[in-house]
């Protein structure tokens, strides 16, 4: 009624307005609207959107048509909108402003938005069909509310009896609301409908209510009643049509609005599928529902699996006037022969594998059969039988019938309640299915019975078999106080505490009792422990007896094993500690570094042996064989303590300022703390300068002379000697350097030691000097001379001297060119006339210490031909001819 009023008002207003020319065409898409006019035609300038018949929309963004573009005698008016098209909406009362070619004045009252062509809905999509009980549908598209609503949609403008309003949700005045994406609620109804997006009936979408569905089909044959459950059935019986196999059904009632239909007086005799179609007000089910009327089985006969034969099935609905059934027993087809409503016959071919409790299906047109009782009716072929079972040489042989094949047969052994399965790849069955053989697995108990199954059909007999005792030795005993652990299989179960096994080794006349067998390894077998007499060697025969059964086997003693080594006082003898060496020197062979040293053995027992240490021995592996039994583990690597040959310095009995002492020997760098090499000087530790396996160079920290030098290997004394230091000698007196920051001088000599005092006497004063002693051959030696003829890992220490580096303790100014140098080394005093040379600052640091300088004269004599510096050549002292030259080659590895 409301929509008819809208239409009437528009018609009334149109009588009082001027009708302008219509556009030639309207083009619209997601981003634009274009009106095309003839060049002499009036045209639109903008939209004027209304909320209702009297109220303008004040919230709409500005819009206008740009009509400046003219192409081929046509005017193109392009719509411009300051907002998104999602906000372009208005009532059917909205107008457009127009302008004539001859008059620039806009006319905004004369033309309704729907008078001429206008942008109709575009790209309309919907989320689905509403249920007959009503529901929501989401609509999307463009220009959906340009001339209608906005909060209602109409479904008809011509049939008042079928007209209803569809509610549109959303606040169209909300600037964030998208008027092209909204939800509409449909009232309960059915069939096909039209949905109009404008209030003039120009723009519509063909829609319908959802198709009926079927969720269940319930047949009550006793009442001849069918109940169909589902959805979208609406509420009026007159609108419902139900078809079974295309035949329309009468006596239809909607028993639950929208969701349940009942069909009365339904009768069907034949089994098979039935097609169900439901139509509600011309809207049909999307896909026909299929209901199966099954054949019902109450019993089935059996046939031989070898011969096959006719199988008889009894029940109801076993015959159809239009469908020949397919019958399946297990995974085999049974060929249809004939049937009545209550009985069916089919031919089953031979099946060598047979089967028990096989499923049976009589299928009519895809409809599986059911059973009349609560338990399914199944089919069983002939059952296998076993007549006997024997054991010989570990192989079990079964005799019977219908034993099948390894693929469908299964053998299970039950031994005192423990179950063992024989895998099908571990047994064989004869082609005539009368014999089965398999290797007997290890069982803890002697007696067991056999359960033979074929396709889940157990044989009617379970033969029992007893196996002889079987033993396995699982360890090696030690030479003395040893024992062996024996695994026991096929023993009498249960175990009797009063019955214990015994063992007899070799030709012994007496037996040794073993422990009572106990279960081991998750109860898979029994185990006993037996003591073994003292002995050595391999493959020792023994006899094991338990109850009335005996079993022969053998064992080997554990091989010799080395755990450690030790040395006697003085390191003259070596003792090897371990196990299983025996006590007979005639049965033991010892190899050190591949050489047989058995003859050097001085004492032997099961846990150790001692042999003499020879100087020729070097570190290496030691291997032992006792009575033919070798230690197969990785060989024990024997490391020997150090050997000190001599103290090299003792030939000349002298050492210099550096206190260098050289020790020769072998294995000097042992890592064993018990045999660490130490060198003492006057009972004080020395500092290692050059470490090597064969040579140690150490420095004495004690400067007293004479110097008693002793060596120790661990706590054992080695060679010793007494050394004396060289007498101090001054060999080089260079020119005193007078620098801006003070004066300095470097004095060279031999064996410079003791308390050192120094000063420089000049005419005006006596300047105290502070001196540092730098001994040659120190750990941080700076006086090594490179010798190109040596290898890259060697150094040559040649013609070295000690050095005093003296300098004034304060910055002073000295204007003189000569003076007297006073030196006191311990109790000995020296004084020398020296020259003083002023040293200017230089940009080249190396220029101050390069080249040769003339030496100063010594008091009481002169030194000639000596190069100035702490590394010098030979010097001659006046008054006593003295030549000092120390040449030492030291091999030193560089990292």
From Swiss-Prot:
IPT/TIG domain: residues covered: 295-381, 560-638, 642-725
SUPFAM superfamilies per UniProt: E set domains
Coiled coil regions in record: none
Glycosylation (residues): 29, 52, 171, 181, 253, 257, 277, 288, 351, 368, 407, 428, 451, 481, 507, 521, 573, 583, 593, 623, 652, 685, 720, 757, 766, 780, 799
Extent of the signal sequence: 1-21
Subcellular location(s) of the protein: Cell membrane
Cytoplasmic face of the membrane: 883-895
UniProt-reported outcome of changing residue 359 to L: In strain: QS113
Pfam families xref list: Ig_TgrO1, TIG
Disruption phenotype: Cells are unable to sporulate when in pure population although they will sporulate when in chimerae with wild-type cells. Cells form loose aggregate before disaggregating. Cells aggregate and disperse repeatedly. After starvation, cells completely fail to stream and display cAMP relay defects. Fail to rotate. comC-/tgrC1-/tgrD1- triple mutants fail to form spores.
GO cellular component: external side of plasma membrane; plasma membrane
Keyword Signal: yes
CDD domains per the UniProt record, alphabetical: IPT_PCSR (cd00603)
Bilayer-spanning residue ranges: 862-882
Annotated membrane topology: Single-pass type I membrane protein
Keyword terms: Cell membrane, Glycoprotein, Membrane, Repeat, Signal, Transmembrane, Transmembrane helix
Effect listed in the UniProt record for changing residue 455 to I: In strain: QS8, QS9, QS11, QS15, QS21 and QS34
Predominant location: membrane
GO biological processes: aggregation involved in sorocarp development; cell-cell adhesion via plasma-membrane adhesion molecules
Extracellular membrane side: 22-861
Function of the molecule: May be involved in the regulation of aggregation. Activates tgrC1.
The protein, known as: Tiger protein D1
């Amino acid at each position: 009624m409301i929509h008819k009023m809208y239409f009437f008002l528009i018609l009334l207003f149109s009588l009082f307005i001027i009708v302008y020319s219509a556009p030639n065409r309207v083009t619209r898409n997601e981003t634009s609207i274009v009106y095309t006019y003839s060049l002499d035609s009036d045209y639109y300038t903008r939209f004027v959107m209304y909320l209702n018949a009297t109220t303008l929309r004040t919230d709409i963004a500005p819009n206008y048509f740009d009509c400046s573009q003219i192409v081929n005698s046509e005017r193109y008016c392009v719509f411009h909108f300051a907002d998104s098209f999602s906000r372009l909406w208005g009532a059917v009362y909205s107008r457009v402003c127009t302008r004539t070619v001859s008059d620039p004045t806009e006319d905004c009252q004369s033309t309704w938005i729907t008078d001429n062509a206008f942008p109709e809905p575009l790209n309309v999509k919907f989320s689905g069909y509403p249920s007959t009980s009503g529901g929501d549908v989401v609509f999307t598209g463009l220009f959906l509310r340009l001339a209608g609503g906005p909060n209602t949609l109409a479904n008809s403008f011509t049939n008042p009896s079928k007209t209803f309003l569809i509610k549109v949700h959303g606040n169209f005045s909300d600037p964030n609301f998208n008027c092209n994406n909204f939800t509409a609620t449909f009232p309960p109804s059915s069939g096909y409908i039209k949905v109009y997006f404008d209030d003039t009936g120009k723009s519509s979408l063909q829609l319908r209510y959802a198709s009926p569905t079927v969720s269940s089909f319930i047949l009550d044959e006793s009442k001849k009643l069918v109940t169909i459950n589902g959805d979208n059935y609406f509420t009026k019986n007159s609108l419902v049509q139900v078809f079974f196999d295309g035949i329309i059904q009468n006596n239809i009632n909607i028993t639950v609005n929208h969701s349940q239909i009942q069909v009365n007086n339904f009768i069907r005799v034949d089994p098979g599928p039935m097609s169900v179609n439901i139509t509600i007000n011309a809207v049909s089910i999307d896909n026909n529902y299929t209901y199966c009327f099954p054949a019902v089985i109450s019993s089935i006969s059996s046939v031989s699996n070898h011969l096959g034969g006719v199988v008889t099935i009894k029940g109801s609905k076993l015959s159809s006037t239009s469908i020949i059934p397919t019958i399946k027993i297990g995974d085999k087809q049974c060929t249809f022969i004939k049937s009545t409503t209550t009985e069916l016959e089919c031919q089953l071919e031979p099946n060598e594998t047979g089967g028990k409790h096989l499923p049976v299906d009589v299928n009519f047109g895809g409809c599986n059969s059911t059973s009349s009782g609560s338990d399914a009716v199944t089919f069983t072929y002939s059952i296998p039988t076993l007549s006997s079972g024997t054991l010989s040489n570990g192989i079990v042989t079964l005799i019977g019938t219908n034993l099948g094949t390894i693929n469908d047969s299964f053998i299970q052994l039950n031994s005192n309640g423990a179950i063992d399965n024989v895998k099908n790849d571990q047994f064989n069955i004869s082609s005539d299915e009368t014999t089965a053989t398999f290797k007997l697995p290890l069982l803890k108990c002697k007696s067991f019975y056999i359960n033979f199954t074929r396709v889940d059909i157990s044989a009617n007999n379970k033969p029992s078999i007893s196996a002889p005792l079987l033993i396995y030795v699982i360890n090696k005993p030690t030479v003395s106080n040893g024992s062996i652990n024996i695994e026991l299989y096929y023993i009498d179960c249960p175990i009797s505490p009063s019955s214990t096994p015994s063992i007899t080794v070799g030709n012994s006349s007496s037996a040794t009792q073993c422990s009572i067998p106990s279960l081991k390894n998750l109860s898979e077998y029994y185990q006993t422990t037996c003591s073994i007499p003292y002995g050595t060697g391999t493959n020792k025969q023994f006899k094991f007896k338990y109850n009335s059964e005996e079993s022969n086997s053998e064992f080997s003693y554990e091989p010799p094993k080395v755990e450690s080594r030790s040395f006697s006082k003085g390191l003259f003898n070596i003792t090897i500690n371990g196990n299983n060496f025996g006590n007979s020197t005639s049965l033991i062979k010892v190899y050190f570094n591949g050489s047989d040293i058995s003859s050097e053995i001085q004492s032997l027992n099961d846990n150790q042996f001692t042999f003499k240490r020879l100087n020729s021995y070097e570190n290496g592996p030691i291997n032992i064989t006792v009575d033919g039994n070798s230690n197969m583990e990785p060989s024990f690597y024997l490391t020997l303590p150090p050997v000190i040959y001599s103290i090299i310095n003792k030939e000349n009995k002298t050492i210099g300022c550096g206190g260098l002492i050289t020790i020769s020997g072998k294995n000097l760098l042992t890592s064993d703390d018990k045999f660490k090499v130490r060198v003492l000087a006057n009972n004080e530790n020395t500092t290692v300068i050059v470490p090597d396996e064969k040579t140690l160079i150490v420095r004495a920290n004690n400067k007293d002379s004479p110097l008693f030098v002793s060596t120790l290997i661990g706590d054992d004394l080695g060679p010793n000697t007494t050394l004396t230091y060289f007498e101090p000698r001054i060999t080089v007196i260079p020119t005193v350097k007078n620098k801006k920051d003070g004066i300095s001088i470097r004095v060279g000599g031999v064996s410079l030691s003791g308390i050192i005092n120094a000063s420089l006497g000049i005419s005006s004063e006596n300047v105290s000097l502070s001196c540092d002693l730098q001994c040659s051959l120190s750990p941080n030696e700076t006086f090594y001379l490179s010798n190109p003829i040596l290898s890259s890992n060697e150094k040559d220490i040649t013609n070295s001297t000690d050095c005093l580096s003296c300098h004034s303790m304060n910055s002073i100014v000295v204007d003189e060119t000569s003076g007297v140098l006073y030196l006191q080394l311990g109790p000995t005093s020296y004084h020398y006339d020296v020259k003083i040379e002023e040293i200017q600052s230089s940009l080249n640091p190396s220029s101050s210490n390069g080249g040769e300088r003339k030496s100063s004269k010594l008091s009481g004599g002169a030194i000639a031909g000596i190069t100035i510096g702490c590394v010098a050549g030979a010097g001659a002292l006046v008054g006593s001819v003295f030549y000092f030259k120390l040449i030492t080659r030291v091999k030193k590895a560089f990292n």
